[in-house]
Amino acid sequence: MARQPLIAGNWKMNLNHLEAIALVQKIAFSLPEKYFAKVEVAVIPPFTDIRSVQTLIDGDKLLLKHGAQDVSEHESGAYTGEVSGPMLAKLGCSYVVVGHSERREHHAETDEVVNRKVRAVLKHGMSPILCVGEPLEVREAGGHVEHSTTQLINALKGLKTEQIRQVVVAYEPVWAIGTGKVATAADAQEVCAALRTALADKYGKEIADEVRVLYGGSVKSSNIGELIGQNDVDGALVGGASLNGDEFTKLSAMAAGGPLP
């Protein structure tokens, strides 16, 4: 089946709620409506911006989706600083990024923690954007495919086959995040294809063919065309470029198959 490309802008810890409103307006009103039928575009702001973004998208009936950068594995309770799945669902989030390499590195998130967070997202009707990917030393040793597929399968343990349809996978080689280095289109295709094969082996080809696999790591308008032209790359998880309205809009338009008018 044809998979609709997804361009998701991960703002990380950037932009206050006023800056968020300005950026969402710029993206929504710069990208021609016809492109939204060809590519799904989502913004992933910090927690403090989500309500403002939701209000703008809902109030102006914008075609953008929005999501969150993380979720607690817990439903509620004495977990100071945590934000739960039910809270994010009430904020209208379509997506929640789970297992980003920065969470794995700076917050010591294991595959087991990531698995519990994936479950928390799915339980409340949202789609996890599940991040997997290798550090430079693993890439240089030739273990990048095994590393990434192992992370994937571990993060999906215990899920029902039907739940897998709701998962978005993002391959983000750690050495390419925020470094200016980018995996070649062939590099991205190699791992994204391997991830889809791993899904097919575990859950069947029909399910695997429905799951969108994104690439993340120094994605720009100058390389999105070649990346998304690969058979198993279904879009991008965009970092730094998503903070620039003009660049993110151009990137999204190119993913839809056409330049800005």
Curated annotation (Swiss-Prot):
It is an enzyme of class 5 (isomerase). It comes from Saccharopolyspora erythraea (strain ATCC 11635 / DSM 40517 / JCM 4748 / NBRC 13426 / NCIMB 8594 / NRRL 2338). Its EC number is 5.3.1.1. InterPro entries: Aldolase_TIM, TIM_sf, TrioseP_Isoase_bac/euk, Triosephosphate_isomerase, Triosephosphate_isomerase_AS. This is Triosephosphate isomerase. It holds the Pfam family TIM. Homodimer. It comes from the Bacteria. Its main location: cytoplasm. SUPFAM superfamilies: Triosephosphate isomerase (TIM). NCBIfam families: tim. Pathway: Carbohydrate biosynthesis; gluconeogenesis; Carbohydrate degradation; glycolysis; D-glyceraldehyde 3-phosphate from glycerone phosphate: step 1/1. Belongs to the triosephosphate isomerase family. GO terms for biological process: gluconeogenesis; glyceraldehyde-3-phosphate biosynthetic process; glycerol catabolic process; glycolytic process. Involved in the gluconeogenesis. Catalyzes stereospecifically the conversion of dihydroxyacetone phosphate (DHAP) to D-glyceraldehyde-3-phosphate (G3P). GO terms for cellular component: cytosol. The keyword Isomerase applies. It is found in: Cytoplasm. Keywords: Cytoplasm, Gluconeogenesis, Glycolysis, Isomerase. It catalyses: D-glyceraldehyde 3-phosphate = dihydroxyacetone phosphate. The active site is at residues 100, 172. GO terms for molecular function: triose-phosphate isomerase activity. Substrate binds at residues 10-12, 178, 218, 239-240.
